[in-house]
Amino acid sequence: MTDKVIEFKGKVSGLVDETNVTIAIYGEDLDPDDISQQLGCQPTFSHRQGERRSHGSPPYKQGAWFLEVKGNAPHGPEDLTKALLMRLPADETIWVELARKYDIQMRYGIHMDTWNRGFELSPKLVQRISKLHTKLSFDIYAVGGNDDA
């Protein structure tokens, strides 16, 4: 019997390669200026219901307000989420009121250059996120192929 040796030719494990973290607020009657005033910061992008992305594009069905941070390893989801949250109010009553009127989402875009990457969020950060009364959404993209291993 011959022992086979499996050789890995690529990098496995480690922190995800690229991350986008976005707080997204949606609502039919959403006024982006009002949201900016309540949160004390300007959005990365926003629009009102009925506005158009460009001439000829369909009108938006609802208003939206987005604040996004992006980064690459070694800055992963934990660091970027903290950076995003530092720009937003910690007062939970603001978020309770917003969640009563609007759909709030914390969205993660996770990009990997190979098939095996990961990340963790600390208990303290998860507790802070919970005070936003938001859904969490994860879009995960693995652009590398199995030929890396």
Short names for language-model regions:
Residues 1-119, 123-149:
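Acidic (Asp/Glu-rich) sequence patches and key acidic residues
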